[in-house]
Amino acid sequence: MYNGNVFQSGGNVVATAIYNVAAGTWTAGPTPPAGLDQADGPSALEPNGKVLAMYSPGLFNTNCAFMEYDPSSNSLSYTSPGVASNPACPQDSSYYGHMMVIPTGQIMFTDFGTSPVAVYNPVPGVVAGVAPTILASSNTLAIGSTNNVLYGTNLNGLSQGGFYGDDYQGDTNFPLVRLTSQSTGNVYYALTHDESTHSIKPGIIMYTKFDLPATIPAGLYSLQSVANGIGSNSFVVSVH
């Protein structure tokens, strides 16, 4: 988590656990209610620092529930409006689900059943000090150009973003480049590649290369680096 601790949740109907990385110690976390557990299941770290997790009762049983862990109060609570807050419930078990933190800061949910794709909207907010920071980038970019370079810190984010277990990982610890038109507000994404590192250690200076779409209109744009749904400071660029 962004506070430097690890939130552990598993398949036993017991308390969750918190691992303090700096101290090397474990403490008990909250116990999920109603016999819920995560005998395989997805979780995602929200930009606000909370953890969204999918639970279900017992081993591979259906009737799932979605809960948030709040590290500030060491508590688990159902997502609003309640247990059936996702169209996948009640027919899903937790192991059906997958979560991914998307660039908007929302959490996208899919399963391998027939449920529609769902998007969870976390409470707005970003934990202080975790956002990417752009240090340098070209301020003039050609339409369709390739191998442009952006330098910054925290460009990979400070977390994997999404988690599951041994069967699946929805990692988003890599930089995206987002361009927002200052005249229309339309949003475009560049193709990023060849990052200098995939480290999520705070403060590391790194770079990523990016290719502009051939279809992006000319004009002034606010350029941001995005990781795990968290955008950086804006950098004004001219696209021609």
Explain the meaning of each model-derived region.
Residues 1-4, 45-48, 101-104:
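Residue-level detector of Asp-centered blade-edge/turn motifs that repeat once per structural unit
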Residues 3, 26-28, 36, 52-56, ...:
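Immunoglobulin-like IPT/TIG beta-sandwich domains and homologous Ig-like subdomains
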Residues 6-8, 51-53, 106-109:
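Conserved beta-propeller blade signature
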Residues 15-23, 64-73, 117-122:
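Beta-propeller blade signature
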Residues 26-28, 126-137:
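Proline-enriched interdomain boundary motifs that mark the N-terminal boundary
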Residues 39-43, 96-99:
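Beta-propeller and closely related beta-sheet repeat lectin domains
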Residues 93-130, 153:
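Blade-level signature of beta-propeller repeat domains, shared across WD40, Kelch, NHL, RCC1
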Residues 231-240:
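Edge beta-strands of extracellular beta-sandwich domains
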